[in-house]
């Protein structure tokens, strides 16, 4: 997604990436390289960090020194907060893209300081429970009502809560498709047979699809920019599948 966006909007970008040294971080880095294709030389620096590191400041300093004008942060919430603060503290002004796993307003951007997060880009597939633009959305109204009734101690602005509700709806759909045949084989077969399923919490245009040879239900995201105290989506829903 990010590679596709940069190729279209900033084809001369010099990209630096910070990622956690685990399978997810390495997969994201590989996906970026694959997405850039023959333009992979746009990636000028990449640094991994260990989850046990108390601070990632030294990595940010190294990435800035690379001459990069575009910074992609594929980090956990704690490190994302540190990265946003450090970039602002150094006066570095790259095009800043924050991985969606740590794009929560409540747990990342607010602790990092809204003033430091202005203009940061990300991409996501779900509606933000903290964003008033969804207050009259029928799907989100059902989500809010569910929380009020069954989980009043949970925050609708918590990205993991939004994710959990949508994932639970997808599981209900799988079990509904399975009918009375709740064997493991049939449940797995139905999980690999989702067709254009739309949970209440996904952005308009995003649909869940799986097949026997494609187990990734969500392969679409929409770019968004942080403005004021909320995310503002822009542009079309983008497919992350290579070749599309």
Where are these regions (language model features)?
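Extracellular/periplasmic Venus flytrap/periplasmic-binding protein
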Residues: 1-91, 133-134, 138
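Segments of small-molecule ligand-sensing domains
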Residues: 149-162, 172-233
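Extracellular/periplasmic periplasmic-binding protein-like sensory domains
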Residues: 87-163, 237-242
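Conserved beta-strand scaffold positions in the cores of enzyme catalytic domains, especially
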Residues: 43-48, 120-122, 223
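Short hydrophobic alpha-helix segments
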Residues: 46-47, 235-237
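Short amphipathic alpha-helical coupling segments at ligand-binding clamshell hinges
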Residues: 139-143, 167, 182-190
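Buried hydrophobic packing segments
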Residues: 2, 6, 167-175
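Extracellular/periplasmic catalytic domains that process cell-envelope and extracellular macromolecules
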Residues: 9-10, 64-66, 89-91, 112-116, ...
């Amino acid at each position: 997604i990010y590679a596709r966006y940069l190729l279209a909007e900033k084809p001369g970008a010099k990209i630096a990436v910070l990622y956690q040294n685990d399978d997810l971080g390495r997969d994201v880095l590989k996906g970026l390289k694959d997405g850039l294709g023959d333009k992979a030389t746009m990636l000028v620096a990449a640094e991994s960090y260990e989850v046990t590191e108390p601070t990632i400041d030294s990595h940010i300093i190294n990435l800035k020194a690379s001459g990069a004008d575009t910074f992609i942060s594929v980090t956990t919430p704690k490190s994302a907060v540190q990265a946003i603060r450090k970039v602002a503290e150094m006066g570095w002004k790259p095009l800043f893209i924050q991985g969606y796993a740590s794009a929560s307003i409540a747990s990342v951007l607010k602790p990092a300081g809204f003033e430091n997060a202005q203009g940061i880009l990300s991409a996501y597939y779900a509606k933000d429970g903290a964003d008033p633009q969804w207050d009259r959305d029928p799907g989100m109204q059902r989500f809010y009502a569910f929380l009020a009734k069954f989980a009043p101690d949970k925050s609708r602005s918590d990205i993991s809560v939004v994710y959990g509700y949508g994932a639970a709806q997808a599981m209900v759909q799988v079990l509904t498709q399975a009918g009375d045949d709740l064997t493991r084989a049939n449940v797995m077969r139905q999980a690999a047979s989702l067709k254009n399923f739309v949970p209440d919490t996904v952005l308009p245009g995003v649909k869940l699809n799986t097949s026997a040879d494609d187990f990734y239900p969500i392969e679409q995201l929409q770019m968004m920019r942080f403005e004021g105290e909320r995310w503002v989506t822009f542009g079309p829903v983008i497919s992350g599948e290579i070749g599309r």
